[in-house]
Amino acid sequence: ENGRVRFEGDLRDIMVANLWLRTADRVKIIVGEFDATDFDSLFEQTKALPWEDLLPIDAAFPVEGKSHRSQLHNVPSVQAIVKKAIVDRLSTVYHRRTRLSETGATYPLEVAINKDHVLLTLDTTGPSLFKRGYRKGKGGAPLKENMAAALVMLAHWFPGNPVVDPVFG
């Protein structure tokens, strides 16, 4: 897939990936994947997922969205339907009749729809991994650390060999 690398692992693997991946921007958990061409299908299939395994009762879970070449192209409506489905699921599982407080930790979610295929993910990273930088002061347009690491890997550079950067300024 363009822009993604998938792997299977456990919680330890997620922590290790966030700590040591040099070229990644984010590490996300795939919560669910399915096809949906209408809002009812999106709602029901989202609600059927085991959200209680990932989100505590007080979780704040903002839902970001994107849609490409799909019948469900109104992103704000898609985000609202996904949010409502998760709230319904958690309210049922946690036996809540009142509104969920969402005062706890934040669990950023994303709904991405491409050609009617829905991918629901939970972001485990927080700020982008390129922001973990080692530099205290940065110039006007620094190269992101993950991009620099990718370029070094693509160049087949070995320690001890000189590095020439013709665009260093």
Where are these regions (language model features)?
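S-adenosyl-L-methionine
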Residues: 1-26, 65-80, 112-160
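Non-catalytic nucleic-acid substrate-recognition regions in nucleic-acid-modifying enzymes
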Residues: 1-107
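Short, glycine/acidic-rich beta->alpha junctions
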Residues: 103, 143, 169
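Conserved class I S-adenosyl-L-methionine
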Residues: 159-169
